[in-house]
Amino acid sequence: MKLWILGLGEFFQRYRNIWREIWKIRKQLDTPARQKDENEFLPRHLELIETPISKKPRLIAYLIMLFLFLAIVISIISKVEIVASATGKLVFSGHSKEIKPIENALVKDIFVKDGQFVEKGQLLLNLTALGCDADKQKTKVSLGLERLDGYRYKSLLYSIEHNRLPLLDFNQADFDSVQEEDKTGARHLITEQFETWQKQKYQKELAYQRKQAEKQTVLANIRKYESASRIEKEKLSDLKKLYDVKSISKHELLAQENRYVEASNELSVYQSHLKEVESDLLKAQEDLKLVTQLFKSDILEKLQQNIQREKQLTLELEKNEQRQLASIIRAPVSGTVQQLKTHTKGGVVTTAETLMVIAPEDDVLEVSALIQNKDVGFVEIGQEAVIKVETFPYTRYGYLYGKVKTITLDAIEHPQLGLVFNSIIEINKKTLTDGDKEIQLGSGMSVIAEIKTGERSVISFLLSPLEESITESLRER
């Protein structure tokens, strides 16, 4: 190994010495300097050899190399913006308000015209919903009748508690929709039902009183035969003593014993009858209570049903009133009337048909842009964007500048672009300039938003296809 190193050292030393000697005599090796006309008189081949090479090709070569070097340096140093293009349109932050009817209706009055400024709450249209007035009146009458029935039931309950009719007042506001004949009928019905209940109760009270009288009669007979039985028993005892001393005959004793047995049997019969009368009396008392309980239970059941029907009719009336209110269309916000589509009084409008659009006053103009699926991963909130309005060429009117405000988290299906993500971009102004003239932008104008997602050097941009090709070529498929 050492010999190899020594050999290489001697080899390079020899060439260094030779180069040094040649360098010393380098000027002697040059051709003698001649003038241009001297070179012209030389033979052709010598003229070509001796004539100095022109400096222009060398200068051009140097310039090309310089430009190439500068291009490489600039491509490394300079950066280009990476943008994600998104199509969209200008919208107001509060969005334009579409005015639509909730149902089919006839146009009764039109109070605005296209381009007119309206205040919030100002009357726009007056519609007539088909059958709304009739439905409301019908429901109102039905509700009044139900309230009248409810008042009748409550009056009867009061009558049951106090055993007399209350002072009936049918001039309340709840009964304004009820006709007088209905009120009179209700008054008569209350009186009739109360009197019927009173008669039934009176009949039961009479039956109860009869049973009480019968009970008193039975009690009197019981007391009578208790006394008679006691007396006959004492007589029988005395006669037994006389019979024992042979003072009376046996027939007299047996006759007295028979009278005692008869008195005892009559007493037993009336005592048994007393139990039956007491049972009948208890039943009569229950029947008397049952008349009131059944009448009250029937009234309470009907009152409960009446309350349910009244609630349903109240909701139905509110629904009809809401239909009437919905037919009177007012401006939801202050703004300008646009796209007015109905101009004929008496014309027909259909459910959810857009009658006009209200562009809100002093609302912020924004861009609603659709970001393609391939770009959404690089777009972030706060990134800057350049907005080009298709209506006005940017080469003449310039751009709008903005920042990404929001990005939806869920994609939506677009018929041309496929799955896209909706985003909102704030813009710095809502006008474009053409010389000294300012052009007002409006909602609905189509735009192209170029969102700046980053920067990239020019050299990497140029080499990326090569890098991609190399990467794919070195991979087994």
Swiss-Prot record:
Function: Involved in the transport of the toxin RTX-III.
Membrane topology per record: Single-pass membrane protein
The UniProt record lists the keyword Transmembrane helix: yes
Effect on the protein upon substituting V376I: In strain: 405 / Serotype 8
GO cellular component term of the entry, any: plasma membrane
Gene (name only): apxIIID
InterPro entries from the UniProt entry: MFP, Secretion_HlyD_CS, T1SS_HlyD
GO biological process, one term: killing of cells of another organism
Residue numbers on the Periplasmic membrane side: 78-477
Species the sequence originates in: Actinobacillus pleuropneumoniae (Haemophilus pleuropneumoniae)
Transmembrane region(s): 60-77
Family named by the database record: Belongs to the membrane fusion protein (MFP) (TC 8.A.1) family.
UniProt cross-references to Gene3D superfamilies, sorted A to Z: 2.40.30.170
Key words, A-Z: Cell inner membrane, Cell membrane, Cytolysis, Membrane, Transmembrane, Transmembrane helix, Transport
Location in or out of the cell: Cell inner membrane
Listed name of the protein: RTX-III toxin determinant D
